[in-house]
Amino acid sequence: MWSLGGLRLAAGHCLRLYERNASSSLRFTRNTDLKRINGFCTKPQESPKTPTQSYRHGVPLHKPTDFEKKILLWSGRFKKEEEIPETISFEMLDAAKNKLRVKVSYLMIALTVAGCIYMVIEGKKAAKRHESLTSLNLERKARLREEAAMKAKTD
């Protein structure tokens, strides 16, 4: 029986074979801007792109929102909100988010350990008072039997 992954591999293999063996005028292309003229593919005339201010060294920049600014502050990347530049790279924001995720996970681990320790202490106090689930259930059942007996006597 064919699995879904096997079908994908087979389809990809067949497509690569077809692309390799197809004639140049009929070759598949992932660039949709190509035009077919007289059996030849030509690229349309492209105007030279002017570098925008949002790209510096080939890295796209992003204007952070207020919440993202708080993330940058909480992660320790910047000390004050005034220090945060107008635009930041996505890599800087991802690094700050990852650092904050790690800090939050450490906080949750610490709270879980503290909660476990607190429950152990409370359980030992309840054991000293001879309080257990078994004794509480026996008391509740005895009280319910008494109420049922009182109700039976009044009827």
Swiss-Prot record:
Localization: Mitochondrion membrane
Cystine pairings recorded for this chain: none
InterPro entries: DUF1075 (IPR009432)
UniProt key word Transmembrane: yes
Transmembrane residue ranges: 104-121
One of the protein's GO biological processes: neuron apoptotic process
GO cellular component labels: cytosol; mitochondrial membrane; mitochondrion
Stimuli inducing this protein: Induced by hypoxia.
Sorted UniProt keywords: Apoptosis, Membrane, Mitochondrion, Transmembrane, Transmembrane helix
Membrane topology of this protein: Single-pass membrane protein
Subunit record text: Interacts with HSP90AB1; HSP90AB1 is essential for FAM162A mitochondrial localization and pro-apoptotic activity. Interacts with VDAC2; the interaction is probably involved in inducing mitochondrial permeability transition.
Family assignment from sequence similarity: Belongs to the UPF0389 family.
Name of the molecule in the record: Protein FAM162A
Lineage per the UniProt record: Eukaryota, Metazoa, Chordata, Craniata, Vertebrata
